[in-house]
From Swiss-Prot:
PANTHER family documented for this protein: TRANSCRIPTION INITIATION FACTOR IIB (PTHR11618:SF13), TRANSCRIPTION INITIATION FACTOR IIB-RELATED (PTHR11618)
Gene name linked to the record: tfb
Species this protein is from: Methanococcus maripaludis (strain C5 / ATCC BAA-1333)
Residues holding Zn(2+): C43, C46, C62, C65
Protein name per its UniProtKB record: Transcription initiation factor IIB
Superkingdom: Archaea
Length: 339
């Protein structure tokens, strides 16, 4: 009995160690696959971590004792080499990467709406009728039930709002993930799809430090500011999203760009806001108003002055707000501004 138990332990031990070099079954149909990123392997015989991959023999071998950990492997990587992103895109023969901004994550296909063949020639009437039927069934296959139909509508609405606001790709992906999380937890029931989509986009903007105000999102969406704010607080609580208060510094690059101010003004405004933050002048105040006042002060100091009306229009605040924040910053930071 003792001999059998020892033999079992010795046979199990190599399997547990070798398993690290094998692809997961859900990732590949064949287990004998060479992975580009592997966990650190340990030789089951000598305990060495010096493991090499022999591509000519298709084996994973211990460099110290020569033990073959795995053999008859298949390399799933490309046969070509690329030295920059442009070459990689040009030589790649696969489709677009998976994205959360499409209801089916971009894994389905779409039939082109133009009635032309691969050579650009018009197709016959019979083929045109056949293509019409194929397109109709393809649309039905892509959106099979009510939940997918609602998700497709919500993600298209989210993409529309993001396009109006000029938001980057990472913000859209983040917002789509948040919306999908809300759907999985059943947070959509009793609320409008547009409201949850706008709230998810607002949360994604704050998370990715590309801030947009509730007023800006409400202006391009079909939902008012109050509903977006209420829905945002609800999904933040239910999805356990903890976001720090918006930093006024995050607004400076966008405001400075819209006002066509040079980089020196932007740097000066950021410096003013950092000093104001150290003295607690930015807390319990609207970040857009503080950022607008800092930009106004910096533009005057750098000799590229913009009027309070111009800054207020870009920041979406009133001139009174800028004057109040301007007085606080100049008094507490001892900034001498000559108007």
């Amino acid at each position: 009995m003792k001999v059998e138990s020892v033999v079992k332990e010795e046979t199990k031990k190599p399997e547990r160690k070798i398993k690290l070099a094998i692809a997961k079954p859900e990732d590949y149909s064949n287990k004998n696959v060479i992975l580009e990123k592997e966990e650190e392997l340990i030789c089951p015989v000598c305990g060495s971590k010096s493991i090499i991959k022999d591509y000519e023999r298709a084996e994973i071998v211990c460099e110290m004792c020569g033990c073959v950990l795995q053999q008859n492997l298949f390399d799933v990587g490309p046969e070509w080499r690329a030295f920059d992103h442009e070459q990689r895109v040009k030589r790649s023969r696969v489709g677009a990467p998976m994205t959360y901004t499409i209801h089916d994550k971009g894994l389905s296909t779409v039939i082109d709406w133009r009635n032309k063949d691969s050579y650009g020639k018009d197709i016959s009437a019979d083929k045109r009728a056949q293509l019409y039927r194929l397109r109709k069934w393809q649309r039905r296959i892509r959106v099979s039930d009510a939940s997918e139909r609602n998700l497709a509508f919500a993600l298209s609405e989210l993409d529309r709002i993001a396009s109006k606001l000029g938001l980057p790709r990472n913000v859209r992906e983040n917002a789509a993930v948040l919306y999908r999380g809300a759907v999985e937890k059943g947070l959509i029931r009793g609320r409008s799809i547009e409201g949850v989509a706008a709230a998810a986009l607002y949360a994604a903007c704050r998370r990715c430090k590309v801030p947009r105000t509730l007023d800006e999102i409400a202006e391009v969406s079909r939902v008012d500011r109050k509903e977006i704010g209420r829905t945002y607080r609800f999904i933040s609580r239910e999805l356990n999203i903890r976001l720090a208060p918006t930093n006024p510094v995050d607004y400076v690059p966008r405001f400075a760009s819209e006002l066509k101010l040079p980089g020196e003004v932007e740097s000066k405004a950021i410096s003013i806001l950092q000093k104001a933050g150290e003295k607690g002048l930015t807390s319990s105040r609207g970040p857009t108003g503080v950022a607008a006042a800092a930009i106004y002060i910096a533009s005057v100091l750098q000799g590229t002055r913009r009027t309070q009306r111009e800054v207020a229009d870009v920041a979406g605040v009133t001139e009174v707000t800028i004057r109040n924040r301007y007085k606080e910053l100049t008094e507490h930071l001892d900034i001498d501004v000559t108007l």
